[in-house]
């Protein structure tokens, strides 16, 4: 609706004033499309624009948002759900649901940031028995080895590598009490994220594990950073 357009323009104008970055992340995940099926205004817009379904309605809206951002000299990033109804080649896809959506986007010519939850969600538990060892939080276990398994270029042709802008580790804070807790969830697993980004073609987990256990505790200690000790104590 025109009211929705006015809202996003006002809100994004504030974002642009605050952040001078080239890229603006507009989200696009977890849209309530079941509600859109029951929404008379949504269904009217689908009919008026000749759209096939609610996925295309989201894409229709995203195209308008992206056009507005381009008019203001910025570029759009969105979660991989924005691909479901089709998206422009200029949009940057942040692939979180799984790596293969990012691979698909890169093959189609979109730029991609790989952040699949199975490898990059650092708020996930660091042990297989979180109720015993960790504060309340997500119970899915993400080991250092599993983080390190990520290959952002898997199943891509060399000519498509340029479409991978990089990788990102995420820490969602619903269950995070303070910044020290953020550090403990991020470190040392962020070291695996960093090595994948810098040396994906020279990965060797056994060598990485030896270096990490030898160097990181002192490094973090000297910097007065909090970190999880499970990896260093071989607690899984």
Regions found by a protein language model. Name each.
Residues 1-7:
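Short, small-residue-biased leader/transition segments that mark boundaries at the very start
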Residues 6, 13, 17-104:
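Gly/Pro-rich turn-and-neighbor structural signature
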Residues 9-22, 132-144:
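Short charge-dense sequence patches
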């Amino acid at each position: 609706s025109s009211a929705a357009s006015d809202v996003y323009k006002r809100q994004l104008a504030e974002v642009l004033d605050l952040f001078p970055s080239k890229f603006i992340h507009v989200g696009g995940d977890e849209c309530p499309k079941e509600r859109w099926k029951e929404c008379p205004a949504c269904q009217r817009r689908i009919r008026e624009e000749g759209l096939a379904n609610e996925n295309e309605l989201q894409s229709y809206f995203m195209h308008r948002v992206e056009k507005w951002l381009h008019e203001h000299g910025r570029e759009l990033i969105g979660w991989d759900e924005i691909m479901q109804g089709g998206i422009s080649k200029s949009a940057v896809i942040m692939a979180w649901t799984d790596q293969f959506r990012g691979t698909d986007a890169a093959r189609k010519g979109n730029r991609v940031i790989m952040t699949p939850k199975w490898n990059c969600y650092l708020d996930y538990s660091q042990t297989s028995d979180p109720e015993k060892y960790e504060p309340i939080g997500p119970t899915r276990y993400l080991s250092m080895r599993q983080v390190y398994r990520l290959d952002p270029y898997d199943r891509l042709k060399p000519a498509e590598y340029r479409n991978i802008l990089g990788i990102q580790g995420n820490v969602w804070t619903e269950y995070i009490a303070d910044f020290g807790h953020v550090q403990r969830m991020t470190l040392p697993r962020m070291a695996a994220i960093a090595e994948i980004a810098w040396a994906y073609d020279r990965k060797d987990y056994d060598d990485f594990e030896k270096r990490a256990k030898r160097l990181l505790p002192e490094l973090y200690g000297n910097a007065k950073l909090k970190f999880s000790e499970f990896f260093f104590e071989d607690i899984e």
